[in-house]
Amino acid sequence: TINQLEYIEDKNFIKLINLKLSKNYKIKEIQELQLNYNTVNKINNNILLIKNKKKYILSSKSFDGINLIKSLTDTSSKANFFDIFDNLSNVIILEIDKTHLSKSNYLKQLNGDLKIENNKIVNASILAKYSEKDKFFFNVKNSNNGEKITTLYSDRAKPFVKNFKFIKGFEKGVLEFQSIKKNNTSKSVLKIDNF
């Protein structure tokens, strides 16, 4: 257990309170985490994670989501961000003012929640906007018959399709993605309209 730790280097700052690690050095629990640093993409990450009973609240003025988008669109990757935890089973409430998806595209007012069980997202409901007319949403739901349904909609396709090598010329379109997974078999549909 680490009761409190602060690290400051130039403009970079890390602070954590009440961090409990497993024998395998995975996070069992954390009460508070503050991060303020510049990423390799030269974007300031300003993040506050606070545990409130059985929920975590993740708030941020600025969040670099570029690598997150790359990991979500890399179908060959088996990596899971939540694997840094030792059996995370909590709700994470998201309140992010500005989420960078690329150097020139970002979401405003990203809000929602993730329900995590055993380090996996079982339910999610996230809304954001690029502008007053351009929207974004991401949902994950589990049906009663064992299907995991993932839906992503973006009025701007560019931040997502630029990571797919087989898609060229669709940057201006609207992106709709749906995946239904059952018994380790997945069926996915990707639509790009109005390009």
Q: What are these model-derived regions, one by one?
A:
Residues 1-195:
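Membrane-proximal interfacial segments on either side of biological membranes
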